[in-house]
Amino acid sequence: MVKLPSASRIRSLATVPSTATRAFATVNPTPPAAQPTKSKPRFEKLDDGLTFDDFLSGDVPPENERVVLGNTKQPRLPSFLKHPIPTGASYSGIKKELRGLGLHTVCEEAKCPNIGECWGGGKGNATATIMLMGDQCTRGCRFCSVKTSRAPPPLDVHEPENTAEAISRWGLGYIVLTSVDRDDLVDGGAAHIASTISKIKQKAPNILVEALTPDFATKGVNVIHTVASSGLDVFAHNVETVERCTPFVRDRRAGFSQSLKVLEEAKKGAKAAGREILTKSSIMLGVGEMEEEIHETLRRLRASDVDVVTFGQYMRPTKRHMKVDRYVEPEEFAKWKNVAEGMGFLYVASGPLVRSSYKAGEFFIENVLKKRRAAAAEHAASQLSTQPPEIAAKV
């Protein structure tokens, strides 16, 4: 039998105020309604900005009150640095031939802005800078877009022959070879570069060869002499920037003094082999250098007996690379050309789009080298003519 509560107990419970909320097992209690909050417009500045009617009326606010979109932390690319997209039969033909032989060019790997101009010329005028030893570099310079690897693939033993074959087909008068750094190789790839130059000279004896080389750091001077005495005409190695900026621009294994030593040893190695070569280096502007530092760099290059120097604008290849400090005006490039020529450099190329292997400079150097060859031949002929007839006949 269930015992019921007494009547007094029921009355006492009825008089106690209840704060409990009634809920059903199958229905969630409804929370108190929240006060609606006004969401902030995503493009508030644009909503408060100009309308189409404002532009029609001409009432445009001052520049400091306008909304600016995009990257404002880097200087805007000037019009004189903009270049057309490369096209044309010559461009397509060179690209197809390079692919067929499995060759790489620094023109493509380094995203050179002059590729359309250099590859777009007719036969005898088109130029391409062949990049030897693959497309993966053991260095990681902050300005360069060439791929980096600690362990690149082995060298292609057929590359020297394929390179010489391609160049002989083009019918060029001047060719530029460059390469990635290969710190993983015992000689840094010097023998591979020298072999390529020798094979080019065998297939096309009259062609002039320029080699833009690595610094061969820790490999010794003999590897520099190997390349310099291989039959090339121009030995190029770039200091890239002033000494103070070198640690921030180039790979930590590269050094300004080491680069000067490479250029000096190249002249010594060629002379020891009975050859006469030109040496060449390049400087990028717009990476944070100061005027006096450029003067000092030029003085040290001349002290190292460098014959040719080029100036060009640093252009950021991707957002992963270091930013441009400033865009140098064409007038300043013209100034540095005059300064360098006054210091005794044989040839100076200076301009926003000039690169170390720029064809305008190649044509000038080609003429200089041909004149030197002609002068040497004339001197030899004059020496021969002064000999007695019987000795001259033996010679």
Swiss-Prot record:
- Compartments, record wording: Mitochondrion
* Its EC number(s): 2.8.1.8
> Known SUPFAM superfamilies for this protein?
Radical SAM enzymes
Q: Which residues bind [4Fe-4S] cluster 2?
A: 137, 141, 144
- Reactions catalysed: [[Fe-S] cluster scaffold protein carrying a second [4Fe-4S](2+) cluster] + N(6)-octanoyl-L-lysyl-[protein] + 2 oxidized [2Fe-2S]-[ferredoxin] + 2 S-adenosyl-L-methionine + 4 H(+) = [[Fe-S] cluster scaffold protein] + N(6)-[(R)-dihydrolipoyl]-L-lysyl-[protein] + 4 Fe(3+) + 2 hydrogen sulfide + 2 5'-deoxyadenosine + 2 L-methionine + 2 reduced [2Fe-2S]-[ferredoxin]
**Per the entry, which co-factors are needed?**
[4Fe-4S] cluster
Q: Identify the metabolic or biological route this protein is part of.
A: Protein modification; protein lipoylation via endogenous pathway; protein N(6)-(lipoyl)lysine from octanoyl-[acyl-carrier-protein]: step 2/2
For this UniProt record, the keywords arranged alphabetically read as follows: 4Fe-4S, Iron, Iron-sulfur, Metal-binding, Mitochondrion, S-adenosyl-L-methionine, Transferase, Transit peptide
What Gene Ontology terms describe where this protein resides (cellular component)? mitochondrion
The protein's superkingdom reads Eukaryota
Radical SAM core domain residues are 122-346
GO biological process terms, semicolon-separated? lipoate biosynthetic process
Q: Mind telling me where the transit peptide is? A: 1-24
Chief localisation class: mitochondrion
Query: Sorted alphabetically, which PROSITE patterns does this protein's record hold?
Result: RADICAL_SAM
Q: Where does [4Fe-4S] cluster 1 bind?
A: 107, 112, 118, 357
Task: List the Pfam families hit by this protein, alphabetically.
Answer: LIAS_N, Radical_SAM
Co-factor binding comment: Binds 2 [4Fe-4S] clusters per subunit. One cluster is coordinated with 3 cysteines and an exchangeable S-adenosyl-L-methionine.
Where are its TM segments located?
none
**Gene Ontology MF, one:** metal ion binding
Q: PANTHER family, from UniProt? A: LIPOYL SYNTHASE (PTHR10949), LIPOYL SYNTHASE, MITOCHONDRIAL (PTHR10949:SF0)
Which NCBIfam families does its entry note? Answer: lipA, PRK05481.1, PRK12928.1
Q: Which family does it belong to?
A: Belongs to the radical SAM superfamily. Lipoyl synthase family.
**Full protein name:** Lipoyl synthase, mitochondrial
